[in-house]
Amino acid sequence: MGRTQLQQTYDRLARLVPANRIIISTYREYVSIVKEQLPHISDDQILDEPIRKDTAPAVAWAAYRITKLDKKATILVTPSDQDIRNEDAFRANVHEALSFIEKKKEAIVAMGVRPTRPEPGYGYIQRGDNVDHDIYTVKSFTEKPNREFAQLFVDSGEFYWNTGMFFARAKQ
């Protein structure tokens, strides 16, 4: 049997950062599944969300907890359901984002993927001005547009699929 998406995400991140620095935030009911799939991680690497309230509150709560552990941490938020087919390109993009965050400590970097088709089930990031190599300001976010707008976004060349991955520094 193959690796689950959670295990693949963990493996991918463990090639980028020390494994003991990977923190998994999950709803309380799923903690046992996380422990079953990743038996080698310690309990303090799992943040069990007390209330299921979607992504933003979960990320805010996890960021608060991580900041308490290390005020100078760089935080990478990533869903565990990503389908990453080019690991080398992913690692290069992560390193580029981390380098940018090191220079611009107040920045938040959202990772997007160039769309290959109109997909109304995905969120979109509209690219703004170029600020560093392959890093742009964000002009707009659009959450799950209808197919017509998704097609316009793809045709414009200004939009990326929102991966849900982003980087930020812990509050200093």
Identify the residue ranges that each predicted region occupies.
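Conserved N-terminal catalytic core of the sugar/cofactor nucleotidyltransferase
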Residues: 1-79, 85-91, 95
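Conserved core of the sugar-phosphate nucleotidyltransferase
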Residues: 85-171
